[in-house]
Each structure stands twice: as structure tokens, then as C-alpha cells.
Amino acid sequence: MSIVAELKPTSTFSFKPNKHSVSDFALPTTRVESWKYTRVGAIDSNWEQAERNESIVALEKGIRIENGFIALPTGQISGVSFTAGKNLSAEQQGLVLSMLAKENRNDVFDAISEKASNDLVLIEIQSGKIIEETISIEIENTLSDCMSTPYMFIVSKENSIAKFTIDFKGKTERSFHLVQLHALVEQSAQLEIHQLQNTSKNECVLLRESISQSEKSVFKITTVTASGAWVRNELNIRIE
């Protein structure tokens, strides 16, 4: 069962962890509407989830995601909390599920993420906190034929200010990143994200971002793509 499926008491998923491959899912073989910006020929049925590595070298001031699994920072950032999926409180679980419910595409990519997600992290910026230092998120596949499917949730609470960098890196022969990022930007909060996608020419990246922001909040995002077999970025922003 995936990390997200475990949050849903009505789930009937029976998938075993770390045993999924792309061939388990009904990926499209023609250029249907939901796939029109992607070269379907780049899909590799050999992609599969890696085993969890308990010795990931964590960052001091940010998140390290290696082969889909998340290592929390070793240091503290004042005003910021990082919570792994397995440690979410009942209140945090409710928050995560409410954010997921806002963006329900019901397509094959959501099926992969929901049923075969590797890991999950919730990052919360406390109310009124101005975070001077940039929070780093480093994403890398170190294994060939690796299917990396993490979830990231960012909550910028009222009157807070925070900036993130998301750095995709890696030089594997073949691998697949399917990253789901959900952010909630509350009243008068500011959230800024800078992304660099610099994987090898044989790696595939699909980044799905769902942003919910209050009317008086500020959200900025910059994405630079340097390389990759195919890269697809989906960004949905809603004003609440």
C-alpha cells in the first residue's frame, strides 16, 4: 500500500510496497489529450520502485529525495516544520487529504502516485514567520530504471514569507521522476519557488504542481529546464 493510500481509511488498494513498475499501470499508447505534450515513446516498462535506503545522506537545511524516498533535514530552520508521512498527526492527515481533494485529475499519473507513492513530506511555514534562508529540496535518482513517485506538501501560513529551490539532478541511464507538489498559501503569505531540472538525457521528469492561494497572498514560480529525455511541467493555480 502506498503512503497516500494509508491515509485513506476507505482505500481498498492492495499493492505491496516497492514492487510496482510502470507495466502495472495502463499508460496511454497514443497521443490522447492528457498526453499530447509527452513523447510516449520515452516510456520504459522496466521502470520500477527502488527499495528504501535508510542511509540517505540528508541535507542540513533542506529535503533530500533519493530514488523517491525522503530524508528530512539534520538541522533546524526557525519557523519551519518538516513532517514525514508516517508521522503525520490526525490534524495534519486531514490537511493533506484536503489539499489532495482540491486537485483530482483522475488520470493515469494520479493513479501511479496514489497507488505507488514512495514517500511524503509536509512542510509548514508558521504564521507570521519570515524565513531569511532559502529552503532547498534536492531530487535525484541514483539507480537506473528507477520510478520515483514522492509527494510534497507545503503550507505557507498567514503573513509568512518563504523561498524554496527545487533542484532535479542525476545522471542515471534510465529513470522516471513523477513528483506531486501541493501548496497552500494562506492570507497575506508569500511563497516563492525556483526550480532547476538538470537530469541526464535519458531521464524523464513529470512535475505536477497544484497551488491554492488566498486573494491577498503572493505566489511566484520559476522553472529552468536544462536537459532530460522528456520533461513535462503541469501547474494549476486556484484563488480561494
Question: Language-model features: where?
Answer:
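Conserved beta-strand/loop scaffold segments within soluble protein domains that form the structured core
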Residues: 91-240
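N-terminal leader/transition segments
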Residues: 1-149, 156-158
